[in-house]
Every structure is written in structure tokens, then in C-alpha cells.
From Swiss-Prot:
InterPro entries in the cross-refs: Nuclease_put_TT1808 (IPR012296), Restrct_endonuc-II-like (IPR011335), Uma2 (IPR008538)
Protein name per the record: Uncharacterized protein slr1290
Lineage: Bacteria, Bacillati, Cyanobacteriota, Cyanophyceae, Synechococcales
Annotated S-S bridges: none
Entry's family note: To Synechocystis PCC 6803 sll1609 and slr1290.
UniProt source species: Synechocystis sp. (strain ATCC 27184 / PCC 6803 / Kazusa)
Length: 190
């Protein structure tokens, strides 16, 4: 999704007010420290990539205890009252079954990169997610070239950045899935 500057003019909302307000909106919004940020639509490639990843994860995890969400499922940033709308997320944590509006403990978060959001997704948004003790994999998927960056948290708690391109095979340890990068990009025009 494409993030825009805070929706203006708009008064600051409490987290509870934001969640109530957001339920009535036609567009998605992220929430950070009382400010609301509109999330615009993405490109055709953005949409196709998100659907393919969601389908891949759903097929792999079918019948298990994990839940897969698209950009309609918000993530509450752990130990805060801030909310993001990643393109795809996976949680296997039973604590996330308590809420119908958001999850807090994803093991995998996917952002399909747009030129306008790439810097934020790699920097500020990653810093928000990185402190989550349950998050193991943060996947940044280009929508303008065949390239995926995987931020993987190792057993020591350090984040490793691995780059994948055409004909590479990517492994998501968080959900025990390995797949060819080409499967995600098949038939897309750049």
C-alpha cells in the first residue's frame, strides 16, 4: 500500500476512537501516536504479488493453527497503541485469537514495496516491527523488479538481511516454507 501524509484536517484520536472510526471507513489507515495515515491503492503488480503470497501461505498452512491476513488485518505494534496495515501477515500465536480487529504477535510480516513507501518500509516500519519478540521474518517484496529482501531474526536475536532474485529459492523459517522466487513474479511486466 502507499502511505500518505497524515489525513488533514483531523483531530488526534485515541487508539479506541481510531479502531471505531476505522471500521466505518472505505479506505485503510495506519495509526501512529494519534495521527492517522491514509493508505492508498497499489499497482497491479502490487496486488498480484500480495495475492500470490497470501495464497501460497494459505495452501501451506491449511488445517493448522496459524492465521493469514491481508492488508485488512491490522497489526498492533507490541507495547504500543500504534497500528499498521501490512500487505500480508501470519500469526500462530494463540493470544491473537482474542481480538477481532487486529493481531499483535505475527511471526511473519510482508510488505510489497512501492516507490513511495520503500524507504519507510525498510527503515521506520521495520524498527516498529523489530522489537516484537514473536516476529521471525520480515519480507520486503519489490513490485518493480524481481527482488525480495528477507529480514530474518536468528536464534541470537540478531536480524540478518538476505537478498533473493530470479531463480533463487527463499526459505521462511517462521512458517517452515521454501519456494521459488519466480513463482511470485511469473508473468508480471516491469
Amino acid at each position: 500500500m502507499i502511505a500518505h501524509s497524515p489525513s488533514a484536517p483531523f483531530p488526534k484520536l485515541s487508539p479506541e476512537e481510531y479502531l471505531q472510526w476505522e471500521e466505518r471507513q472505505r479506505e485503510k489507515h495506519e495509526y501512529f501516536d494519534g495521527q492517522i495515515y491514509a493508505m492508498g491503492g497499489g499497482s497491479k503488480n502490487h496486488s498480484v504479488i500480495s495475492v500470490r503470497l497470501s495464497t501460497l501461505f494459505c495452501n501451506h498452512l491449511d488445517g493448522g493453527d496459524c492465521e493469514i491476513g491481508n492488508s485488512d488485518l491490522k497489526i498492533q505494534i507490541v507495547n504500543t497503541q500504534n497500528y499498521t496495515c501490512p500487505d500480508v501477515s501470519v500469526t500462530c500465536d494463540p493470544r491473537d485469537r482474542k481480538s477481532t480487529q487486529f493481531i499483535t504477535y505475527p511471526c511473519l510480516v510482508v510488505e510489497v514495496l512501492s516507490p513511495s513507501t520503500e524507504a519507510y518500509d525498510r527503515g521506520g516500519k521495520f524498527r516498529l516491527y523489530a522489537h516484537n519478540p514473536m516476529l521471525q521474518d520480515y519480507l520486503l517484496v519489490s513490485s518493480t523488479s524481481v527482488e525480495i529482501d528477507l529480514y530474518h531474526k536468528n536464534d541470537d536475536g540478531d536480524w540478518l538481511i538476505l537478498n533473493y532474485q530470479a531463480s533463487d529459492r527463499l526459505e521462511l523459517k517462521s512458517i517452515g516454507l521454501s519456494f521459488a522466487v519466480d513463482v511470485i513474479y511469473r508473468g508480471l511486466a516491469f
